A protein has these predicted regions:
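RNase H-like (RuvC/DEDD) metal-dependent nuclease/polynucleotide-processing core
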Residues: 2-248
Length: 248
């Protein structure tokens, strides 16, 4: 076990949203310990008793002030890396103002009013608004160093030697490939977590994605994570000062 000041003797966490809350994976490199659980909301996610040094969240954190076709620069860069068909898993985020909407019609109106070329919203994106709003209320520029936006398919891209996983995560073959990649990268107990938590409402895909997010959180803590846009380019910020970036 590492000493108290050992950089490996801390927890990091990854989280993936599902209908009833969040599935959270915590990992401690010093002991190789991994924990997995579900929590109800953002307050619980961001006040975990393990006090993780970094939390990688598969959810948009830096929403743009004006929505654009194709989303933010980081969304477009992520799709370019992943190619077709994995790039379709990166969706365009709503404008910040659309997070205040209570109905789909209002969200559409607010999103389209955010900029000259602003598109409407998909129903899938609208259903994410409660989680996006809760994150937006918590994350400040200062807190963004701890709470980071990640994308599981980008994590698997990095694990897979900078190559997208060919198989869909919704197939048995795709799940097998992703489980094998995670096992190679320190998450040998993944199958136990899937068996314990996946119950129909929470799917095996969600548990696998949360492990991928945790892997990127570990890389962030170690200083080895990469990002979209590339680190050679300065990440743009929105009006609230949040960086619009996706880590892997």
């Amino acid at each position: 076990m590492g000493s108290p000041d050992d950089s490996t003797d801390v927890w990091v966490a990854g989280a993936d949203g599902f209908r009833d809350g969040w599935v959270v994976v915590l990992h401690r490199s010093a002991t190789g310990t991994t924990r997995c659980r579900t929590v109800d909301g953002v307050d619980a996610l961001l006040s975990l008793p393990e006090s993780p040094a970094v939390i990688g969240i598969d959810m948009i954190i830096g929403c743009p002030d004006a929505a654009e076709p194709g989303g933010r620069a980081c969304d477009r860069a992520a799709r370019q890396l992943l190619g077709h068909p994995r790039g379709t898993s990166v969706f365009s985020p709503p404008a910040y103002d659309a997070l205040q909407a209570d109905t789909y019609a209002e969200a559409q109106r607010r999103n389209r009013a955010s900029g000259p070329d602003a598109p409407g919203l998909t129903k899938q994106t609208f259903h994410l608004i409660p989680k996006l709003r809760a994150l937006a209320e918590y994350v400040t520029p200062e807190r963004q160093d701890r709470v980071r936006e990640v994308h599981p398919e980008l994590s698997f891209y990095a694990m897979n030697g900078d190559a997208p996983v060919a198989e869909s995560k919704h197939t048995d073959a795709g799940r097998a490939v992703r489980r094998a990649l995670l096992a190679e990268h320190g998450f040998a107990d993944l199958d136990e977590a899937v068996s314990a938590l996946a119950d129909g409402v929470l799917g095996a895909d969600d548990v696998i994605d949360a492990h991928a997010a945790c892997w990127t959180a570990r890389r962030l803590h170690e200083g080895t994570a990469e990002r979209c846009p590339p680190r050679s380019d300065e990440a743009p910020t929105n009006a609230r000062g949040l960086r619009m970036e996706i880590l892997r």
